[in-house]
Amino acid sequence: LASDPRFMLEGGAKNVARRDGMGTTVLSCVEKMGRIPDVYFQAVGSGTGAIAAWENACRLEADGRFGPNRMRVYVAQNSPFTLMYDAWKADSRELPALEPCEGRRRAEVILASVLANRKPPYGIAGGLYDVLKASKGDFFLASNSDIVYWMMQFRNSEGYDLLPAACVAVSALAQAVREGKVGKDEYIMLNCTGGGTVEAMSKGYVVKSPDLVLSPD
């Protein structure tokens, strides 16, 4: 299917419509909050969601009804897959070199496998590097042990099971609190990008018969 010329790649981070769709999480938050958040947390693989969040925060500021955009974008990766984290901490727009075999090895050992992207839109104009600079943001890391810990803590506290990638964001929030990077009176948006799998599985499975079968002949 992917090799069929009639089907085109949707463009990833360069697809404006995709970014607009991903950025609606900020719109929903502001609708409830009544203002632009002070801090935004998200786990990143490509960083497109964080880019989209920042773009929408800028639009909300231009609208004028939701206050100034002082939203610091705080993102996180699952170690040892730390390409963007390493580049950011080195204050570099360029990602460090990573051999394909080493990239695959790191991708295999992390729990949040969806965060393993070897070619993210990090250093391009308007990419994640620019977003972190413009927002005075920062990067965090979460180990597999951190993910398991915060998965259980969130389930016990909120009654909801998160996917590993979302737990990376929760871990980043906890680190930021410990390091004094967020204030007690600040408005915080924590983007929990997925969950509910355990709850859904506990209800069992229903295999639906197909409504239409197309013969390969």
Describe each PLM feature range.
Residues L1-G64, V148, M152:
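Active-site/ligand-binding-proximal alpha/beta "capping" segment
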Residues V44-G47, E158-A166:
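Short glycine/threonine-rich catalytic loop with a Thr-x-Gly-x-Asp
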